[in-house]
């Protein structure tokens, strides 16, 4: 804190300061008389360029810049889950108590509550040898999440001091470890970690399990592997945020980190209002007991958007290291890219495509490459981070740089379609433009845990949808009536798949979440109906008789009429379909 520079230039969030000898790259600094938080992004001799994470209005040359000696870091410890932070990990509820509805410039608050006492259960004893990532104590952070206090990476040695089980604050020392050089290191309930440095892991593992979302279009047609990466691009009003909310509510991850990056404040308010009322499907507890929110809304300083993405992924890595499966939702990475473009412009850097900086692809890669399914340091634990980034291309144009560069680093592409959203088809995922490269990796798990037919049924349904798209070109020109009955049957069954299976109601208590078993049975029913109807059409029974409106309507409504826990009703429906078509065949035989 003894080093001090002097501001010589202010341009929005970009500040230049002189007399910065001894400062380091990416160091966290306090800028101006109000001590605004900033980060050094360029050093040239004694001159430093600083990215300021708060409004610089009324700042002037001559004001001081104070050193901290450490990079931009987050505090990792109990108290993160269930909390809401801004982009630089300041807890918004604490700021609201101090300054009211608006964040006062230069306000300093601790990310974690220093006064709250946590019940600590120590897991090591004197004389034990510990290694990086080993769990030394456990804290019940919420009724769902047990917080594991770990030996920091790069520290190993012998335990020389241990406190008894009891209640402790995050600042109190729990365990003291003597390293091989004879130095003592105190382990507290919290540790700091630089946001731009990925946390180390033991080993990266191949992705074998799906991240189940309860959304049929994703789980069945375009599944995401646990530890995988996905992008949700879509124009304005296509349903990106609603889809992200659904994924945050119902996905099978243990921890959800939701980063609202440059989007509207009302969207974060929706999350705050809804999540406490919702039950986690696997535990029955409140959703907020497994969720971390990072809110960096559109009216907050632009520079902090970049920090919010890194803050979120660092918190996700911390819980991954404990052995949890974490899902991080970033809404939206386009706003982060726009922040990079704005700051790059103020730095007078050479622009690349559409004004974005030339390093946009490498920044996106840095972010998405921090996902993965890993074996953690220390004990034999496995954890994962699944990254789902929304992309907001202007005018829904998927050829723009952010969407195109994101496609290079993700293996799951869920393209949202404005025309589907306008037709009230949600989730508005275009099944012809979307893809998942995880299907082959996950096929073993799906066959073993759901049914051997899963992939076969999915591929049959996809072929029908593709064939229906080709037929629609003819229908638009000459109408449906001129098509032969076998092609009209394809149109009818594709309609069943689209309305009865792919369309899902986020506000329905029955339909908002579908178990894999229910999804399998729904698709099986539709394909069973197609397989029973096709031979009848081949034998010249007219489509008007084959298409029984009552039966087709029942198939469409099965998503609402048959709850997750009552799968026997599918067998009854299948029996009725078989009975109808057998009777129809017999009548025509006579």
From Swiss-Prot:
<dbReference type="InterPro" id="IPR027417">
    <property type="entry name" value="P-loop_NTPase"/>
</dbReference>
<dbReference type="Pfam" id="PF16886">
    <property type="entry name" value="ATP-synt_ab_Xtn"/>
</dbReference>
<dbReference type="GO" id="GO:0045259">
    <property type="term" value="C:proton-transporting ATP synthase complex"/>
</dbReference>
<dbReference type="InterPro" id="IPR000194">
    <property type="entry name" value="ATPase_F1/V1/A1_a/bsu_nucl-bd"/>
</dbReference>
<comment type="similarity">
    <text>Belongs to the ATPase alpha/beta chains family.</text>
</comment>
<dbReference type="InterPro" id="IPR022878">
    <property type="entry name" value="V-ATPase_asu"/>
</dbReference>
<dbReference type="Pfam" id="PF02874">
    <property type="entry name" value="ATP-synt_ab_N"/>
</dbReference>
<keyword id="KW-1278">Translocase</keyword>
<dbReference type="GO" id="GO:0042777">
    <property type="term" value="P:proton motive force-driven plasma membrane ATP synthesis"/>
</dbReference>
<keyword id="KW-0406">Ion transport</keyword>
<dbReference type="GO" id="GO:0046933">
    <property type="term" value="F:proton-transporting ATP synthase activity, rotational mechanism"/>
</dbReference>
<keyword id="KW-0547">Nucleotide-binding</keyword>
<dbReference type="InterPro" id="IPR023366">
    <property type="entry name" value="ATP_synth_asu-like_sf"/>
</dbReference>
<dbReference type="InterPro" id="IPR031686">
    <property type="entry name" value="ATP-synth_a_Xtn"/>
</dbReference>
<dbReference type="Pfam" id="PF00006">
    <property type="entry name" value="ATP-synt_ab"/>
</dbReference>
<dbReference type="InterPro" id="IPR020003">
    <property type="entry name" value="ATPase_a/bsu_AS"/>
</dbReference>
<dbReference type="InterPro" id="IPR004100">
    <property type="entry name" value="ATPase_F1/V1/A1_a/bsu_N"/>
</dbReference>
<keyword id="KW-0813">Transport</keyword>
<dbReference type="InterPro" id="IPR024034">
    <property type="entry name" value="ATPase_F1/V1_b/a_C"/>
</dbReference>
<feature type="binding site">
    <location>
        <begin position="234"/>
        <end position="241"/>
    </location>
    <ligand>
        <name>ATP</name>
    </ligand>
</feature>
<dbReference type="GO" id="GO:0005524">
    <property type="term" value="F:ATP binding"/>
</dbReference>
<comment type="function">
    <text>Produces ATP from ADP in the presence of a proton gradient across the membrane. The V-type alpha chain is a catalytic subunit.</text>
</comment>
<dbReference type="InterPro" id="IPR055190">
    <property type="entry name" value="ATP-synt_VA_C"/>
</dbReference>
<dbReference type="InterPro" id="IPR036121">
    <property type="entry name" value="ATPase_F1/V1/A1_a/bsu_N_sf"/>
</dbReference>
<dbReference type="GO" id="GO:0046961">
    <property type="term" value="F:proton-transporting ATPase activity, rotational mechanism"/>
</dbReference>
<keyword id="KW-0067">ATP-binding</keyword>
<protein>
    <recommendedName>
        <fullName>V-type ATP synthase alpha chain</fullName>
        <ecNumber>7.1.2.2</ecNumber>
    </recommendedName>
</protein>
<keyword id="KW-0375">Hydrogen ion transport</keyword>
<keyword id="KW-0066">ATP synthesis</keyword>
<dbReference type="Pfam" id="PF22919">
    <property type="entry name" value="ATP-synt_VA_C"/>
</dbReference>
